[in-house]
UniProtKB/Swiss-Prot annotation:
Part of the 30S ribosomal subunit. Contacts proteins S3 and S10. It holds the Pfam family Ribosomal_S14. One of its GO terms (cellular component) is small ribosomal subunit. It comes from the Bacteria. Keywords: Ribonucleoprotein, Ribosomal protein, RNA-binding, rRNA-binding. The gene is rpsN. Belongs to the universal ribosomal protein uS14 family. The lineage of its organism: Bacteria, Bacillati, Actinomycetota, Actinomycetes, Micrococcales. This is Small ribosomal subunit protein uS14. Residues 36-72 are annotated as: Disordered.
C-alpha cells in the first residue's frame, strides 16, 4: 500500500495537468509551427517554461486504482499485477482465465 500523501499528490497532479492541458497544447503547436517566426517560437518556449512543473503529463504516475501501488501496473485494467492475479483467481475479472497448455 502506497503512502496516502503520494496518492494525494498524484491526484493533485492529474488536476493540474487537466487544468493546463489546453494552454500547453496551444504553446506546443506554436513551438513546432514551421511557418512561425523565431520570436514566436521563443515566446512559446518561454510560455511553456512559465507553466507549473506539474502541468506536464509526464509527471503523473500510473498507480493501482485500489491501493496506489506504483509499479507493475497493467494499464488496460488500471490495477497492479499482484491485484490482477488475485482478482483473476477469485473470478472477479470477467473473461480472464488462467492459461493452461
Amino acid at each position: 500500500m502506497a503512502k496516502k500523501s503520494k496518492i494525494a499528490r498524484n491526484e493533485q497532479r492529474k488536476v493540474i495537468v487537466e487544468r493546463y492541458a489546453a494552454k500547453r497544447l496551444e504553446l506546443k503547436k506554436a513551438l513546432v509551427d514551421p511557418n512561425g517566426t523565431d520570436e514566436s517560437r521563443e515566446a512559446a518556449r518561454a510560455g511553456i517554461q512559465r507553466l507549473p512543473r506539474d502541468a506536464s503529463p509526464i509527471r503523473v504516475r500510473n498507480r493501482d486504482g485500489i491501493d496506489g501501488r506504483p509499479r507493475g501496473n497493467l494499464s488496460k485494467f488500471g490495477i497492479s499485477r499482484v491485484r490482477f492475479r488475485d482478482m483473476a483467481h477469485r473470478g472477479e475479472l470477467p473473461g480472464i482465465t488462467k492459461s493452461s497448455w
